[in-house]
Amino acid sequence: MLTDITLGQYYPGNSFLHRMDPRAKIICTMIFITAIFIAESFWSYLLVTAFLLMTISVSGVPIKLIVKAIKPLWFILVFTFIIHLFTTPGTTLFYAGIIHITREGIIRGTYMTLRLVYLIALSSLLTYTTSPIVLTDGIEALLTPWKRFGVPAHELAMMMSIALRFIPTLLEETDRIMKAQASRGADFTTGNLMHRAKSMIPVLVPLFISAFRRADELATAMEARCYRGGEGRTKMHQLQYTGRDSIGFAAVVAVTALLIGMRMMS
């Protein structure tokens, strides 16, 4: 399960998406996420699905990596579907005691589950096609106009970058500790939920110690390199908008406009 969590991992490549400006990718992702919540009909969801599959194809990221990113959240997806299945009023398809399944419940549950799948796929695509350093530069550039209002743009971007970088590291550390505990007879797979939660305590304690140790080592390394924040810092590669960014914007805006049109006509 831990090896299936891919948040923060970068997939090297030279695709159209890899070469887009990180600012453009972040903005396009935010616009497309908004477009997902505009979708309400079968045809609008079909359009979103087709555009997302086309984006994945253009990115060069294997579809199995997107599926791998979705797998750890299967419980949330199933729970979302069940909640809407049993709580949405409408045309009754099945009724037995407290179980009341409606046609609208099935449709609503499917749509809400698809929205979550789309959100996971989009966030995964962003991190797969953008290295942590480039993503940090993009976030910092987008936050820079807010510095006049006292927003610490560089510090926030650096925190996000470190957090994304540490996720795979901590997952690897967790997996290593669990294997070490299992070799000593620990069981993490059997028993009820409470038993499994208690069995994780021997994992959490060394994990927290390891996390604090790594954080201290990182702070020491940054101080040794005279890190003093973003003031006066220069970058090896300057961010620059290109024609491919305009194409990306145009495609996302066009799909969003179509979804708004479908919503207004439905």
Q: Model-predicted segments: where are they?
A:
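Transmembrane helix-loop junctions in multipass membrane proteins, especially transporters and channels
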Residues: 41, 45, 60-64, 88-96, ...
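Loop-to-transmembrane-helix entry motif
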Residues: 69-73, 77, 113, 117, ...
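Juxtamembrane/interface alpha-helical elements of multi-pass membrane proteins
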Residues: 73-186
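Alpha-helical transmembrane segments and their helix-start/interface "positive-inside/aromatic belt" motifs
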Residues: 25, 64-74, 248
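Transmembrane alpha-helix interface motif
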Residues: 1-44, 48-57, 141-151, 155-158, ...
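Alpha-helical transmembrane segments and their membrane-interface exit regions
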Residues: 51-61, 76-79
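Membrane-helix interfacial "entry" motifs
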Residues: 14, 37, 60-65, 96, ...
